[in-house]
Amino acid sequence: MLGATSMRVHDVTLTLRPGMPTWPGEDGPRVEPLKRMARGDSSNVSVVTFGDHTGTHVDPPVHFLEGGATIDQLPLEPLVGRCRVLGYGDDDHISGHWLDGAGIGMGTERVLFKTRNSERWRDPRAPFDQEFIALDETAAHWLVRAGVKLVGVDYLSVEPFGSGKLGHPVHVALLRAGVVIVEGLDLHDVAPGDYELFCGPLKIAGGTGSPARVLLRQR
C-alpha cells in the first residue's frame, strides 16, 4: 500500500518555450538574457515575455465578460481539491448527452477531459491544430447544472475553433456561472480516474488570464 509520501505526482503543465503552439494571432513566449555570469555578471537573470493565455493557463471571467473578475480576484478553493479525469475517445466534440453516461458522481466539483488532443503534446513543436476536441454548448450547460466549479481541457480552448463567430457560447456559459476554466493541460501520461488537483495561476493585477502550474496527485 502506498503511503502519502510515495504517491505519484503528475505535472500536467506544458513547458513554456519559444516555438510552442499558441492561439493563432498570439505571440509565443520569449526568453532573453538580462544578466549572465559567463559575461561577468554576478548572477544569471532572464526576461521572460508571454501572453497571459500561453501554454497551460487559467481563464477568469473577465476573459469574455466585460467587468468580470480578473485572475487575481479568483477564489482559490476551486483551484485545489479532488478532481475527476475523464477519458474521451470520440472524434466529435464533447456533448451533454455524452456526459449523461460519463459517470460523474454527485458532488464532483472539478472535471478534466483527456482526449486525443493530449497526444499532440508529445511533440512540443507540433503546429496549432484547428481540429482539436472541445466542449459543445450542451456540455457547458450540463456541467453548470451539475455544480462543477472547475473544468480543464487538454488543448488551448475549452470550445471548438471558430466559435468566436457564435459569441464564444461555451466560455460565456461557464464563466457566467463562476466556473474556472483551465486550458492547455498535458494529460497524455495520466490515466482516467480520481486525483487531487493543485492549480497555481500567477497573481497578476488585472490579469485577463495567467499561465499556471498544474499538478495531479494520485489518490
Feature roles, as predicted:
Residues 1-219:
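Active-/binding-site microenvironments in catalytic and ligand-binding cores
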